[in-house]
């Protein structure tokens, strides 16, 4: 299997909403750092479906799809994967390519700004190849419309010329598989979403699954870790394998500086406390969000923009990076009137609902 990344995917995406400051990636960010993209993640990715830990139901469905496609000597049906970042959407795509013995071309929707960007990728596909488009909900209208006949009829319709002299030329494409990844499945248009034969959601991982992932990664990195140490890291990883692997590397740093030889529960706990990752996997920004809501808005309900303005954090970052996990563990509730801090969050912060905090 060859992995090819679109050259355009390295072009910085335009994001007018981002501002410098606290919304820079943190230790618990589910999005990969540049270094992780280039080296670490590639090294520790599994290459077979049976080696992929977690997502049991999804694995069963994909195994059936692959077996059926191989029996028919056909390509896989188009697949849409959705869920929070860091759960393995790219890894699954690479595994499918490896298992099917085809190439996987990787790109992201923000890189496909012009029709020629997607056209160049499509016409270079070989039979059975997989085209993986990350953040597919961000495709522009022209690019999306080019994909409709490509997905449905394996045909690329190109307009040549302008005005009255314009004509449409159709180019035959080999049968291929489009895998789209998104954190916002509701943002996809119905015509695009309806062209996927399989639509599957990735869920957050359980602690026992993350423990196995940490143990596997530690073995690949030649790092000694006890099961208790792996569990301590897993417990603070926000249900996300990418974060678990990142925390393992930081705990390994701490162990080496302390001249340790093995990551046990005590050492892992000490290291993660230094990195301000608490027992529930919250970092200082999570706590800032909760404390701001309690201190300034009496626990809510409060709107997202008000939280962003009060914390100095970007609203999109709060919504996409921090809020999903706080909702998952029940620390936040979303109501028609806004976000509300739950009683469980008060308890975790050592407060009663009547108490208030001073912002640190």
Swiss-Prot record:
Residue ranges of the region described as Head domain (RuvB-H): 279-360
Region of interest: Small ATPAse domain (RuvB-S): 206-276
Annotated keywords: ATP-binding, Cytoplasm, DNA damage, DNA recombination, DNA repair, DNA-binding, Hydrolase, Nucleotide-binding
Residues where Mg(2+) binds: 90
A single GO cellular-component term on record: cytoplasm
Region (Disordered): 1-46
Catalytic activity: ATP + H2O = ADP + phosphate + H(+)
Family to which this protein belongs: Belongs to the RuvB family.
HAMAP family in the record: DNA_HJ_migration_RuvB
Protein name stated in the entry: Holliday junction branch migration complex subunit RuvB
Organism: Rippkaea orientalis (strain PCC 8801 / RF-1) (Cyanothece sp. (strain PCC 8801))
Lineage of the organism: Bacteria, Bacillati, Cyanobacteriota, Cyanophyceae, Oscillatoriophycideae
Gene: ruvB
């Amino acid at each position: 299997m060859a992995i090819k990344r679109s050259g355009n995917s390295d072009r910085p995406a335009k994001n007018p909403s981002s501002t410098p400051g606290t919304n820079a990636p943190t230790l618990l960010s589910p999005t990969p750092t540049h270094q992780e993209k280039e080296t670490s993640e590639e090294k520790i990715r599994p290459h077979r479906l049976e080696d992929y830990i977690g997502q049991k139901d999804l694995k069963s469905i994909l195994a059936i799809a692959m077996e059926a496609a191989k029996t028919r000597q056909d390509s896989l049906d188009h697949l849409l994967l959705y869920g929070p970042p860091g759960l393995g959407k790219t890894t699954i795509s690479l595994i499918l390519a490896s298992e099917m013995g085809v190439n996987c071309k990787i790109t992201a929707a923000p890189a496909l700004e012009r029709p020629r960007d997607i056209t160049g990728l499509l016409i270079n596909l070989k039979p059975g190849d997989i085209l993986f488009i990350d953040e597919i909900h961000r495709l522009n209208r022209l690019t999306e419309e080019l994909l409709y006949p490509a997905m449905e009829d394996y045909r690329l319709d190109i307009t040549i010329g302008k005005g009255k002299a314009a004509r449409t030329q159709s180019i035959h494409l080999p049968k291929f598989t489009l895998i789209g990844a998104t954190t916002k499945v509701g943002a996809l248009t119905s015509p695009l979403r309806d062209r996927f034969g399989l639509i599957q959601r990735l869920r957050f991982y359980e602690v026992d699954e993350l423990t196995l992932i940490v143990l596997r990664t530690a073995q690949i990195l030649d790092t000694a870790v006890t099961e208790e140490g792996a569990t301590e890291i897993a417990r603070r990883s926000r249900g996300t394998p990418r974060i678990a692997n990142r925390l393992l590397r930081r705990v390994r740093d701490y162990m080496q500086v302390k001249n340790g030889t093995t990551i046990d529960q005590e050492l892992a706990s000490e290291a993660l406390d230094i990195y301000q990752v608490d027992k529930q996997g919250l970092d200082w920004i999570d706590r800032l969000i909760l404390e701001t809501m309690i201190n300034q808005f009496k626990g809510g309900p409060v709107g997202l923009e008000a939280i962003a303005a009060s914390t100095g954090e970007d609203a999109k970052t709060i919504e996409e990076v921090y809020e999903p996990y706080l909702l998952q563990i029940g620390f936040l509730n979303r109501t028609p009137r806004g976000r509300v801090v739950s009683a469980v969050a008060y308890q975790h912060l050592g407060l009663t609902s009547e108490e208030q905090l001073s912002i640190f």
